[in-house]
């Protein structure tokens, strides 16, 4: 696990839990020349788009403030399924 994904996990974990979900994994990958930061979540009964939206809206400003990633990237929150 990279230092970037470790830092993002630390930032994301409390938010994900407050929203009633579980943090499944974090990945930071380069695809076709673009960096992607992906936060995968899960919850009993399944994750819906509103779960992803709420977590994304809460986590995005924290990532902007903490700035754990030096490059520009696309931020996504999705389900592990």
Ranges and model annotations:
Residues 1-81:
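Short Lys/Arg-rich amphipathic alpha-helical segments
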């Amino acid at each position: 696990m990279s230092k970037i994904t470790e830092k993002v996990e630390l930032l994301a974990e409390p938010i994900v839990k407050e929203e009633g979900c579980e943090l499944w994994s974090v990945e930071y990958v380069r695809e076709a020349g673009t960096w992607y930061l992906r936060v995968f979540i899960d919850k009993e009964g399944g994750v819906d788009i509103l779960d992803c939206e709420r977590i994304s809206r809460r986590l995005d400003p924290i990532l902007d403030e903490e700035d754990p990633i030096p490059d520009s990237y696309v931020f996504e929150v999705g389900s592990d399924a």
